[in-house]
Amino acid sequence: MSESSVLIVFPNQLFKNHPGLKAEIKKIVIVEDSLFFGDISFQSNFHKQKLWLHRASMKNYASWLKGKGFEVHYQEHSKKSDVLFSVLKKLKSEKSLKLISCETHDYELNRRLRNHTHKLSLKLEILSSPMFLNTQEQNSDYRNGKKRWFMADFYKFQRKRLDLLMDGDQPLGGKWSYDEDNRKKVPKNLHSEIPKLSTFRRSATEQEAVEYINLNYSSNLGKLEDLIYPTTHSAAKKWLDDFLNNRFSLFGDYEDAILKGENWLWHSVLTPVLNIGLITPEEVIGAAKKKAHDNNVPINSVEGFIRQIIGWREFMRATYVDCLLYTSPS
């Protein structure tokens, strides 16, 4: 890699093992991109808790990188200008010759990144991302020649490809899906035993994010109360462990249950930390496999959870890329 290579990190790329960290980079620029905070062209009134999660997790990531010895620059969001273009223009003026980034997993962000770097004559290298288990090439190879595009078919392909819950070439237990066993109502005798989500003592960084969002996004939806989401790699790992230890075994039975006054029941609530990169699907699957093996977790819980990660999540990403449709970052 060139000495003047710069790694750019977006809000959904906070990977502990970011592939760009292995490169010979001059510095790292973390960008509060407008597509995640508020964009002029794609106007969205993002919930304050989403904005808080991005701000706090990105600030924590910057501190973590500095602790690793990297030179880190943090670019805040601007409501009036194209922050990404401004960052790239500055890098160009500093004689940065090459920009390194992970796959963005967002059509519009990818389009802008490529257009801006081309306009500024900046070399751009896109690295594979650990955000998903499948590569685009694997999904395309599977998709080619298929007359129909159903999640159930894709899920079987995934189970076989990843050798998960398989007995030879057949599904473990004799069924590909235990969805019919995931629709029980929560009995009254369990109402008082629904596990509570673990909580964290909020850090100074997280409190700064509360004040910053309230000050700069006061008219946005929501309130910054009862904040539950992890904002560091270690907290995300504890969040996963809490699910596996306290909710995993009954997840299958009550996966589709709805109970007034209960927001979480036995769900993992891993989507936010997965979607910003604080934890990866590979880590989640590895930990779930070990927990299931060591503790004889019911197969309807194991299969139901695995299906969400390797099935639905990967299928929706493949569908998004295949259709080339724009949706706002989640």
Write out the residue ranges for each language-model feature.
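N-terminal beta-strand-loop-alpha-helix module at the start
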Residues: S2-H73
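Short alpha-helical segments and helix-capping/turn motifs at coil-helix boundaries
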Residues: F10-N17, L84-K89, R111-R112, A257, ...
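Flexible loop/turn segments at secondary-structure boundaries
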Residues: F15-N17, F36-G38, S81-D82, Y107-L109, ...
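Short beta->alpha junction loops
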Residues: Y74-D82
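Beta-rich, aromatic/charged-enriched effector core domains that present basic-aromatic interfaces
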Residues: V83-Y229
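Glycine/tryptophan-enriched, flexible segments
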Residues: L162-F305
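Conserved alpha-helical segments that form or flank metal/cofactor-binding pockets of metalloenzymes
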Residues: I310-L324
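Conserved small/polar residues in nucleotide/adenosyl-binding loops
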Residues: Y326-S330
